[in-house]
Amino acid sequence: MSASTPPVVVIGGGIAGLLSAHELARHDVDANVFEAGPRIAGMAASHTDPDGFSYDVGAHFVTNRFLAALGMGGSCRTLPRYGEVVHLGGGKYPHYPMGLLGVPRYVTSAARERLLRPDRDLRVAADRFRHDYGPRLADEVALPLLEAWSGLPADQLSASVIDKIPTSLLHTIWLRAAQRITRRAVMIGYCKEEPSATGVYHVYPAGGVAAICQHVADRLPHRVQLSQPAERIYVEDDRVVGARIAGRDIETNTVVSTLPINRLPQLIEGSDRLDRFRRFQFRGLVLVNLKLTGRELLPEVVVWTPQGFPYFRVTETPLSMPWIAPEGKTMILCELGAETGDDVWTLTDDAVVERCVSTLGPLIPDIRARVFGASVLRQPLGYPVFALDYEQERAALATDGTGITGLYSVGRNGEFDHILMEDTFWRLRRRIPKIAQRHTSPSNCHSTTPASERCPT
């Protein structure tokens, strides 16, 4: 890179920011990562409590393909199993999605939908689900779950959300068979950017998911600069010309941001192009981890609870990763949809734990006798909400980006998309070459004017 080309500014020291700098370095582009907090990793944090239980904040699962691409393939454990079921009541737990095809009322409803072809607005999530799966399955399972983690009625949500759900049933059948044959948690629809295959399976890195962030950070040309909040992104004629980090102006023609897209407009000085993203909403989560005696308390790793429970999903992670809990003990994670300040969010820890324990009886009859500890985490940025009100702007962000030359919004929160760590990696691997080329293009290189004079204040 030319000495006159200023480094790329990467805002955020979580996995998306670290991977951005990692990929830029692969293309010989200098980048400085600035993290507002005192440590790297963002949501992807791991720790072990005094009772010997290991916790991950953020994604639990990654694949062997992803870790191999990062050079971490030799430092991971293979997950022996992974599966999802849906609680339908009466002791019925059909597997998702295959087992639902064996429920007679769902099959009949879907067939009737195909035969009668009722008029439906396929831009609306409620109508799209009913069209694709039949009204009974949609109304009893899919839509209640969608509404629980989105926080909006399904007739106010965009059908784009359905594109995030795997629908290739034949492929799913084959991959399920591969799971049984290989006794590995073969990936099924977990990553949207790269295809599922029998040789791609879930693994867990030594040191937890936070170890991935540390591995990437340790191999960057420059140390991540901590406690350095981004305060401004300077724009002239809809082109990035600089940034202010922790009170210091920095000249650059390229900023890669991992901030939530609805907060990014607050930093922009010199353009209102991003104001349309201010009304985007994220749904929060209240995560309740229960420590229990025993194991194999749930019928499968994940149990979806579409009706009759205050949470939409219950997970017994030690069924997939036995090593995260002491022998003879397990953890049950209950996920409740919430918004900052609402009735669920403001419950005390004791109250929200009691709400979970008091309703888990249909799944774990002797739950009270088994519980001996709990922890609660409130995550304000759980899921992006694909509301119809701003679907046009959301689609434009996905196809056209921010609209400001040299400003790239990446990662789950930055792209406002239902993607996980591995999706972010493969997207960046495809995007970064063009970003690097533009950044080093002579027509985009700035002069050597000091940043204090070049950047407006």
Regions found by a protein language model. Give the residues of each.
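N-terminal Rossmann-like FAD-binding beta1-loop-alpha1 element of flavoenzymes
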Residues: P6-V33
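Feature captures the FAD/FMN-dependent oxidoreductase FAD-binding
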Residues: F66-H95, Y133-D139, R219-L226, E231-V241
